[in-house]
């Protein structure tokens, strides 16, 4: 399971021009599910994300986590995060999970996160979405449950 985690001042997601999720200060997560992922991968990423110290304290050091600041989360499913572009010019998505597995683990991830964060909003799985992000920093962290980077 792979996540692109962005620290935001605010973020929103819309489908067909209608807002389906929006947050204030917190994290926007683009989440991709791999074909060999399990609930353990989701658990690992959820814990890692809410405890990741990427918010500044009063001395401007990265010392505070999402939990510390009582921040909000926007989760957007994004299979392209699993793309492999090492060879050729077109990304290969052979490592992305099939629709059923990806949706099940995405929903599990969101529900697990709801137990760990103040507010969790999300997009609509497999929909074409418009995501608006006001980055804070910018601070962008790449996480992979298999720790490939």
UniProtKB/Swiss-Prot annotation:
UniProt lineage: Bacteria, Bacillati, Bacillota, Bacillota incertae sedis, Caldicellulosiruptorales
Subunit structure: Homodimer.
Catalyzed reaction equations: glycyl-tRNA(Ala) + H2O = tRNA(Ala) + glycine + H(+); a D-aminoacyl-tRNA + H2O = a tRNA + a D-alpha-amino acid + H(+)
Stored PANTHER family: D-AMINOACYL-TRNA DEACYLASE 1 (PTHR10472:SF5), D-TYROSYL-TRNA TYR DEACYLASE (PTHR10472)
Protein name: D-aminoacyl-tRNA deacylase
Keyword Transferase in record: no
Gene Ontology CC annotation, any one: cytoplasm
GO molecular function, one term: tRNA binding
Domain notes: A Gly-cisPro motif from one monomer fits into the active site of the other monomer to allow specific chiral rejection of L-amino acids.
EC number(s) on file: 3.1.1.96
Family statement drawn from the similarity comment of this UniProt entry: Belongs to the DTD family.
Motif Gly-cisPro motif, important for rejection of L-amino acids in this chain: 137-138
CDD domains in alphabetical order: Dtyr_deacylase
Known role: An aminoacyl-tRNA editing enzyme that deacylates mischarged D-aminoacyl-tRNAs. Also deacylates mischarged glycyl-tRNA(Ala), protecting cells against glycine mischarging by AlaRS. Acts via tRNA-based rather than protein-based catalysis; rejects L-amino acids rather than detecting D-amino acids in the active site. By recycling D-aminoacyl-tRNA to D-amino acids and free tRNA molecules, this enzyme counteracts the toxicity associated with the formation of D-aminoacyl-tRNA entities in vivo and helps enforce protein L-homochirality.
Entry keyword annotation includes tRNA-binding: yes
